[in-house]
Swiss-Prot record:
One of its GO terms (cellular component) is membrane. It comes from Mycobacterium tuberculosis (strain CDC 1551 / Oshkosh). It is a single-pass membrane protein. InterPro entries: Glyco_trans_2-like, Glycosyltransf_2, Nucleotide-diphossugar_trans. Its main location: membrane. The chain crosses the membrane at residues 270-290. Keywords: Membrane, Transmembrane, Transmembrane helix. Gene3D superfamilies: Spore Coat Polysaccharide Biosynthesis Protein SpsA, Chain A. It is found in: Membrane. This is Uncharacterized protein MT1568. Pfam families: Glycos_transf_2.
Amino acid sequence: MVPGDASSVVSVNPAKPLISVCIPMYNNGATIERCLRSILEQEGVEFEIVVVDDDSSDDCAAIAATMLRPGDRLLRNEPRLGLNRNHNKCLEVARGGLIQFVHGDDRLLPGALQTLSRRFEDPSVGMAFAPRRVESDDIKWQQRYGRVHTRFRKLRDRNHGPSLVLQMVLHGAKENWIGEPTAVMFRRQLALDAGGFRTDIYQLVDVDFWLRLMLRSAVCFVPHELSVRRHTAATETTRVMATRRNVLDRQRILTWLIVDPLSPNSVRSAAALWWIPAWLAMIVEVAVLGPQRRTHLKALAPAPFREFAHARRQLPMAD
């Protein structure tokens, strides 16, 4: 297939594709062609591609424009929305009932869309995920985070979502046991009902999102790799960690799990048991390691009172 050659691509039904493959793109000029190629080569299922460029300063949008099929879309944000809001923009404009995010420096392996989408033939399934292959020069990071799903106990093809949530919360809800968005497919309406990606969580935004989806649905697991995640030091997570914008991430996740009306009592109790220890641990960590100790300690001090009121205001409205 030659990029830009309209005769070499197949158009997509723009009205109602089964899957919306969403690429929240930002300065991915070096990798976007490989990313899009991995999507365009998917077979056996109808899908649209929606690229939402977040005001990039490189040539990634121009590259993407030459590769998209008739019916695919390239949208550009001006000004930049930021990572979390750009993911929500993708959810907003998607037409498919199923959502597959693919980050601009990641790629899908052959058969990924067909394999994951089949799990949604069961209407109770709202989310499906698979292991991802990690490419990184950081051997220690790869060893620690390369096979995150193995932290689950008795992970099956089909799982009760709240039971998976409980396992994660019993261990503190501080690590991503699912993977990045490229490793996951989910129902668009479920994501909207759960409130989308929160914009007040920074490092653990994926963890928060997966937990809220799993509280609301059955979850399928495919036991073989279906995507490739490229990990580099120059990631948004690395930048967040350097500035400690994430000081309240874990408290906000635990608070949400306590107040969410769909949380079973077991999840609420586990989250409540972790709340004070996690809060005190972050206070000590900030006080010892910094940076911006005064600013972050000022944000942490009123958290036991402020965060519960904040979470209740953010809950999705009941029908």
